[in-house]
Regions:
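Sec/Tat signal peptide C-region and signal peptidase I cleavage site
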Residues: 15-19
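Acidic, serine/threonine-rich low-complexity disordered tracts
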Residues: 20-106, 111-250
Length: 250
């Protein structure tokens, strides 16, 4: 049973990582909008690695009488996957900072478009079950920094940005498995002229489990952005979520 619990915790370990994407979900742009970012990761004693992340918005559907859109970040790993793929969250486009900070619980549906195992979707009930089992709790703050304004280079030009402090903490404390605390602490440079509002973000990501402490430094910098006509085809929702398939068939 302890081994099974450890496997499930591995699967849910990606859920707290949504904390780093919530700063992009505030007041989403119109469907068809996209932006790409360079993501650099630095680990102690290792060379810095670089990858490109893409954020986009596609038409969604009404949920409880409210319009929703698909907010997608790609490519990322999700729920213990070995593969990186688009992760799409069905959310309201008009979320303010408070609602965006609760990105997980404010998602009406989540689709992970695994290119090897196939797509699957999670309902609100699925997410609630996972987070309840893991005893997931989190806090999130985005507050004015000093200096309050700063000009930086991003997206090929100088940008006058609002500078904010980011502090987010997520805790998982499931039965039979060691408690894990993940802390994001850093700076976000916001520019209202950028589609997702973020020109750059730099943060330290610290994971504490038992006596083990891991620290990474991550930097996201805007590369490009634009708009293209949204696809008329709906997102492939794939299979329904299954925790057993997740654990034994990742």
């Amino acid at each position: 049973m302890r081994h099974l619990a450890a496997l499930l915790l591995l699967a849910v370990s990606a859920v707290p990582a949504l904390a780093q994407w919530q700063v992009f979900a505030e007041k989403l742009p119109k469907p068809g909008t996209w932006a790409t970012y360079r993501m650099e990761t630095t680990k102690a004693g290792q060379p810095t690695t670089s990858a490109t992340l893409r954020f986009s918005v596609q038409p969604g559907r009404e949920v409880d009488g409210q319009p929703h859109v698909w907010f997608t970040v790609e490519p990322v790993m999700w729920l213990g996957s070995r593969e990186r793929a688009p992760l799409s969250l069905l959310v309201r486009p008009d979320m303010d900072r408070t609602l965006a900070s609760r990105l997980i619980e404010n998602s009406a549906e989540i689709i992970f478009s695994n290119p090897v195992k196939g797509a699957y979707h999670m309902t609100r009930e699925d997410i609630a079950w996972i987070t309840d089992w893991a005893k997931l709790t989190y806090t999130s703050e985005l507050t004015p920094d000093s200096p309050a304004k700063e000009t930086i280079e991003a997206g090929g030009r100088a940008r006058s940005c609002e500078r904010l402090r980011m502090l987010a903490t997520t805790v998982t404390d499931p039965p039979m498995v060691s408690k894990q605390v993940l802390t994001f602490k850093g700076t976000v440079w916001r520019d209202a002229s950028v589609p997702f509002g973020v020109a750059r973000a730099v943060w330290q990501e610290e994971t504490v489990k038992d006596t083990e402490i891991k620290q990474d430094v991550k930097t996201l910098t805007l590369l490009d952005s634009g708009w293209e006509a949204p696809s008329a085809d709906p997102l492939d929702r794939g299979r329904t979520f299954s925790v057993w398939r997740l654990i034994f068939g990742r």
